[in-house]
Amino acid sequence: MSGSSSPSLWLAPNPSKRWGELFFLFYTPFWLTLCLGIVVPYKLYETFTELEYLLLALVSAVPAFVIPMLLVGKADRSLCWKDRYWVKANLWIIVFSYVGNYFWTHYFFKVLGASYTFPSWKMNNVPHTTFFLTHVCFLFYHVASNITLRRLRHSTADLPDSLKWCFEAAWILALSYFIAYLETIAIANFPYYEFVDRSAMYRVGCLFYAIYFIVSFPMFFRMDEKSTDEWDLSRVAVDALGAAMLVTIILDLWRLFLGPIVPLPEGQNCLQSGLPWFSN
């Protein structure tokens, strides 16, 4: 993984950001193969207890922090640890995915009819396992979005601003829905993440899930994209919290005005006042 700053239509001009994005891309096959290439197809999860599920998540997520600390990229050797892109990217995703798991999972329960039935230790009725697995998933999704958005901007550089905006908005919408749909399909063979109506989840629920990325992809892209505007960690955290708040507002507006996509079990009222994680 080169730290070179030579021009590229796909890769970041910032050497640290370029190295970080390439690292996250090259790391993705490890956890993806472990989870979807070994554990799920061979049904190893059938013997898992709470501990094994948590260990699987830790083995998937922890190297995203440890490897770049031990194998420092050429582009990062002259930088303080807090100025390295991989640190900032991890922090942004930690904040965003934590809010997503702790709060938005309850929208999946109340609006999409989802449920987790595998053995797990939980926080706010959300498995600890999902906090860690979501982190590496979202790192991959957002880096992939960065690369494609950068390429799109190069392709539309000579167009009027209004057309550039339209192309970018259309791409973000399409990519967000595609990733939401792809993830739903990818975990379909895992029987302990259930939906009341899986076909409704594929048709409509993926659009609900895509809201996460419609907000987060363009916001995450901005971080350290311009060499004259490098972010510090406090700005990274505040930006991620801002993105998370906007997603929360949109999800709750869906809950109140559009309601659930499936009939809810007796006793669950999606349209009640208040917030869904207060009423389990």
Swiss-Prot record:
InterPro entries xrefs: Cycloeucalenol_cycloisomerase
The molecular function terms of the Gene Ontology recorded here are:
cycloeucalenol cycloisomerase activity
Q: What is its EC number?
A: 5.5.1.9
- Where does it live in the cell? Membrane
Q: Which GO terms describe its cellular component?
A: membrane
Question: Which UniProt keywords are present, listed alphabetically?
Answer: Isomerase, Membrane, Transmembrane, Transmembrane helix
Top-level EC class as recorded in UniProt: isomerase
TM spans (from-to): 22-42, 53-73, 89-109, 167-187, 201-221, 244-264
Which catalytic reaction applies to this protein? Answer: cycloeucalenol = obtusifoliol
Is Signal there in the keyword field?
no
| Record carries keyword ATP-binding | no
Q: Which domain of life is it from?
A: Eukaryota
What the protein does? Converts pentacyclic cyclopropyl sterols to tetracyclic sterols.
Instruction: Spell out the protein name for this chain.
Output: Cycloeucalenol cycloisomerase
Source organism of this protein record: Arabidopsis thaliana (Mouse-ear cress)
Instruction: Give the classification, highest ranks.
Output: Eukaryota, Viridiplantae, Streptophyta, Embryophyta, Tracheophyta
